[in-house]
């Protein structure tokens, strides 16, 4: 039995060897199948400068390997930020259905229409209140307890279906400049002392108040029957007989054919105005015959008080216009001049006034605008003219040229009557019955 066992063992060994031969192949064959294609630098790889393609793109690399490529720690760090950045959108940071775009060490969320914020976390509807960017309204905004704010439009406009925009319903809505809209031009800048000519038709609400043939003051057309100006213009006026208002005027030395001359039926000033003083310096004039609205004669919008104080007052630059002196104690302008002036902080204006002996007090019924370097300012003859502010392409009356220390004097700025304080007073009078002559009306 023993020889037979040895024979079986030998057969098994031979069979196993044959099986192994079937499994294992030669070294050359194995290299041709399994061996990775050797890099170009072969065994000299560690002796040659690093390659970005070889070290970090064909396979993952370490910071040290990248450092070999750039030969600079700073450049390596810059590369490493991008290379080792990862997917910043992996945590789904965008909320409320927003989509995420991966950036270097950052991300951008693209929000759905009703949401905003870095992560689309803010619902726009929750922020639709009037104190926040005027509630998104083009003109007037009203807050409501327990419900969303609503937008409204000035007379002569109507609200569009989107609930925020206003479109004109009349041929000549207030605050628009037909001359500019027909040309598709932008609003000009410039003015008075240091200013530029306001091209014909681009200040269509400007009025020239004439005492006989002499320019008395400027004014602003508010509608077809009313012009607003400064009360101090009439300190020495005892009768309306020689007082006229010229609308559509541009060049005082020429008759251009667009002028409209109107007599004044009624002059109204606040009962608190004291001649020779600067407070409550505003006056309302009723035309004896209504103005005819044209491309060169358009009223300026009288804004609601809240809108004026919360929205318009935050706009830095406004336009002032008039035919005042081009230089202090110089000649009056022949053509209508205009300029954009920056509004100043009330506290800064008050402090400047307090530091100048004999300077009138700046009250809450006034505000300041202009350039402290004395480069641009209103001057004698501009008094009563408009300080107009544009919001979403519509112009509003925000001030009346009142007083200043000289004209364009260094360290001095123009002082304007704050029209928002008189909005209700003006509106009430514009609805009143006609009473001829010069009157004082209780304020407020």
UniProtKB/Swiss-Prot annotation:
Pfam families: EGF, FXa_inhibition, Gla, Trypsin
Domain EGF-like: 85-121, 126-167
Disulfide bonds: 56-61, 89-100, 94-109, 111-120, 130-141, 137-151, 153-166, 174-301, 198-203, 217-233, 349-368, 379-407
Protein name: Coagulation factor VII
Entry-linked InterPro entries: Coagulation_fac-like_Gla_dom, EGF-like_Ca-bd_dom, EGF-like_dom, EGF-type_Asp/Asn_hydroxyl_site, EGF_Ca-bd_CS, GLA-like_dom_SF, GLA_domain, Pept_S1A_FX
One Gene Ontology term of the molecular function aspect: calcium ion binding
Peptidase S1 domain segment(s): 192-431
Stored CDD domains: EGF_CA (cd00054), Tryp_SPc (cd00190)
Compartment(s): Secreted
BP terms from Gene Ontology: blood coagulation; proteolysis
Glycosylation site positions: 91, 99, 211, 242, 306
Propeptide: 22-39
Keyword Metal-binding on entry: no
GO CC annotations on file: extracellular space
Signal peptide annotation: 1-21
Active site: 232, 281, 383
Residues reported to bind substrate: 377
Function field: Initiates the extrinsic pathway of blood coagulation. Serine protease that circulates in the blood in a zymogen form. Factor VII is converted to factor VIIa by factor Xa, factor XIIa, factor IXa, or thrombin by minor proteolysis. In the presence of tissue factor and calcium ions, factor VIIa then converts factor X to factor Xa by limited proteolysis. Factor VIIa also converts factor IX to factor IXa in the presence of tissue factor and calcium.
PROSITE patterns to which the protein is assigned, alphabetical: ASX_HYDROXYL, EGF_1, EGF_2, EGF_3, EGF_CA, GLA_1, GLA_2, TRYPSIN_DOM
Keywords per UniProt: Blood coagulation, Calcium, Cleavage on pair of basic residues, Disulfide bond, EGF-like domain, Gamma-carboxyglutamic acid, Glycoprotein, Hemostasis, Hydrolase, Hydroxylation, Protease, Repeat, Secreted, Serine protease, Signal, Zymogen
Entry similarity comment: Belongs to the peptidase S1 family.
Database matches in Gene3D superfamilies: Coagulation Factor IX, Laminin, Trypsin-like serine proteases
Tissue-specific expression: Plasma.
Principal localisation: secreted
Sites bearing (3R)-3-hydroxyaspartate, chain numbering: 102
